Amino acid sequence: MLTINILLYTSPILLAVAFLTLVERKVLGYMQLRKGPNIVGPYGLLQPVADAVKLFTKEPSRPATSSTLMFITAPIMALTLALTIWVPLPMPHALIDLNLGVLFILTLSGLSVYPILWSGWASNSKYALIGALRAVAQTISYEVTLAMILLSITLINGSYTLKNLAITQENMWLLVSTWPLAMMWFISTLAETNRTPFDLTEGESELVSGFNVEYSAGPFAMFFLAEYTNILAMNAMTTILFLGSPINHNFTHINTLSFTLKTLMLTFLFLWIRASCPRFRYDQLMHLLWKNFLPLTLAFCLWYISIPIALSCIPPQI
């Protein structure tokens, strides 16, 4: 039964990811005054299917000097971790309702660094290794900010359980009261998922696609799926943390529809930023985090610790 549940849970995510690639190409096309994919199927709707067939029927190749085991394991692990992040997310009901859902997500997002590092090192290519090292430095750096923001939200929520955030936001979105945290969280998710303007790990002009430069066919598709799955997962997390709404037990489909629409709006914002912004310089990226975001998140964390004590009240305990 659990296997069926997992399949029913992962299949729509992978389907959404497949069509997200089409939406991205269409949105970027119209923003650049062109059509985007419009040949395969009506209005180009079958383009993701054609891409999948092409990638998974090609023969996967690897460099003769690469480390075989690590080279093959890295994309599989990347996709597995990306899909596992969805397990505790309440949409409005989670696959497994974890008491420490916030910590589980933090742990998995930290582990997602390893497949990138393995792929860069195992490829035995200087471009792949430089891209991997950039990715590790960037991801670990922004993990600190994400963890501090999550700690602040946890203090407001009074629990590590993600489902409680729906109850905390019954009267008002946390976006209204914690908008500086929400802004820093959104920018940090862009950096965490290696999206424009923080796509330094995949700098086409300087690193020839970055850590996955030596990958082709199925393994490349797995990295691609993992990246876009992480984008959707981070936007789903943003919706849960800052745009949550109380669960209507009489009409549960309304909750799911509301959650999906909010996540899609945030994903569209990701695409809009990609079409509009140039790439940051690497030193600017690090300065933004260590000199701006980290002091601010620490200050807000202390603020949210001190307010309940000062007002002689505690966060809502469920």
From Swiss-Prot:
Assigned keywords, A-Z: Electron transport, Membrane, Mitochondrion, Mitochondrion inner membrane, NAD, Respiratory chain, Translocase, Transmembrane, Transmembrane helix, Transport, Ubiquinone
Q: Name one GO cellular component term.
A: mitochondrial inner membrane
EC numbers listed for it are 7.1.1.2
Q: Tell me where it resides.
A: Mitochondrion inner membrane
Which Pfam families does the annotation name? NADHdh
PROSITE patterns in the record, alphabetically?
COMPLEX1_ND1_1, COMPLEX1_ND1_2
Instruction: Please list the reactions this protein catalyses.
Output: a ubiquinone + NADH + 5 H(+)(in) = a ubiquinol + NAD(+) + 4 H(+)(out)
Q: Name one GO molecular function term.
A: NADH dehydrogenase (ubiquinone) activity
| PANTHER family with a match to the protein in the record | NADH DEHYDROGENASE SUBUNIT 1, NADH-UBIQUINONE OXIDOREDUCTASE CHAIN 1
Family membership, please give it.
Belongs to the complex I subunit 1 family.
Q: What is this protein called?
A: NADH-ubiquinone oxidoreductase chain 1
What gene does this protein come from? MT-ND1
